[in-house]
Design a protein with these regions (language model features):
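Zn-dependent metallo-beta-lactamase
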Residues: 2-45, 52-54, 254, 264-266
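Beta-strand-turn-beta hairpins that frame and shape the catalytic cleft
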Residues: 23-26, 40-46, 127-137, 171-178, ...
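Extracytoplasmic
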Residues: 31-33, 41, 69, 93, ...
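Pre-active-site segment of Zn-dependent metallo-hydrolases
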Residues: 40-81, 85-92, 106, 115, ...
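Active-site neighborhood of phospho(di)ester-bond hydrolases with catalytic His/Asp-centered motifs
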Residues: 47-49, 71-79, 99-102, 178-184, ...
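Active-site environment of divalent metal-dependent phosphoester hydrolases
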Residues: 54-55, 81-85, 105-108, 126-128, ...
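Binuclear metal-ion centers of metallo-dependent hydrolases, dominated by the metallo-beta-lactamase
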Residues: 97-98, 109-130, 218-270
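Active-site-proximal loop/helix segments of hydrolase catalytic cores
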Residues: 150, 154-223, 247
Length: 270
């Protein structure tokens, strides 16, 4: 009798654990601009373009690198300051790699700013599987990429080549796919990216001037990529980024794509 009772308890516990695991969801926290903290279903933490401390629209309560907690991986789409942001400090602090365009990481290594183990090389079309069930693919973006850094030799601010800009397709443990576009203008291969990778969620820049404006972003979303959901980003952090979520939503018109109503500091689960 006791044996049957113990077996029943074990089976019940196994069933409960399975339900709990099935209920795990990924969580995406938006700091502002293109900076996100992605926590996967299995609890791995990925930072994307972590411009946090210097970003004017990041909520004050989030301007604390210690409050991020653990970090397992950092993705950087290109070398501009509003994307590489706090990546170097966070990489060293947590002893985790920065995955970025090969030319960007090569420059950091050549200048002696980062140890080789923290700046592995990767390029467009490259795929990494850093954790069980998680796959990250580097894809094209249409932008530029350079870094303004202090030259170790002269001590002067100097502009350095930082590879070519990219975006990332992040596939999570349950198959959910996120396409972080980085900074980009319109380009025809967005259609191929949409057809081939079939992203569920699109993180899309809408501010204009340096990236797509709301009209261009809506065309990319609705006609080329066709995700299930869209998260407008990269606007209002300086006077030239004039595009707004309202303009983007208007340009989208009637659509089955869910346009997320989000502001810096918001979290969503998927």
């Amino acid at each position: 009798m006791l044996g049957r009772l113990l077996i029943s308890i074990v089976i019940a516990c196994m069933g409960f654990a399975g339900v709990a695991q099935a209920q795990n969801k990924a969580e995406l926290l938006w700091y502002s601009q293109a900076a996100f903290k992605l926590t996967t279903q299995n609890g791995k933490v990925i930072l994307i373009d972590p411009w946090i401390m210097g970003a004017p629209l990041t909520p004050p309560e989030l301007k604390n690198l210690d409050a991020i907690g653990k970090v397992d991986l950092i993705l950087v789409t290109h070398g501009h300051g509003d994307h590489i942001g706090d990546a170097l400090e966070l990489s060293k602090k947590h002893d985790v790699p920065i995955w970025a365009p090969a030319g960007l990481n090569q420059t950091l290594l050549t200048l002696g700013l980062m140890p080789s183990k923290l700046v592995p090389r990767m390029n467009k079309g490259g795929i990494i599987e850093p954790f069980p069930g998680v796959k990250i693919t580097m894809v094209r973006a249409e932008h530029s990429s350079e870094m303004v850094l202090k030259d170790p030799a002269s001590g002067k601010d100097t502009t350095f080549f930082a590879g070519e800009p990219v975006g990332f397709i992040i596939e999570l443990e349950n198959g959910f796919k996120i396409y972080h576009m980085g900074d980009t203008g319109l380009f025809g291969d967005m259609k191929m990216i949409g057809e081939y990778y079939k992203p569920d969620l699109l993180l899309v820049p809408i501010g204009g001037h340096f990236v797509m404006n709301p009209k261009d972003a809506a065309y990319a979303t609705k006609e080329l990529i066709k995700p299930k959901m869209a998260w407008p980003m990269h606007y209002a952090s300086n006077p030239m980024l004039r595009g707004t979520p309202a303009q983007y939503k208007e340009a989208m018109g009637q659509t089955s794509i869910e346009i997320l109503d989000v502001k810096p500091g918001d979290k969503k689960q998927f």
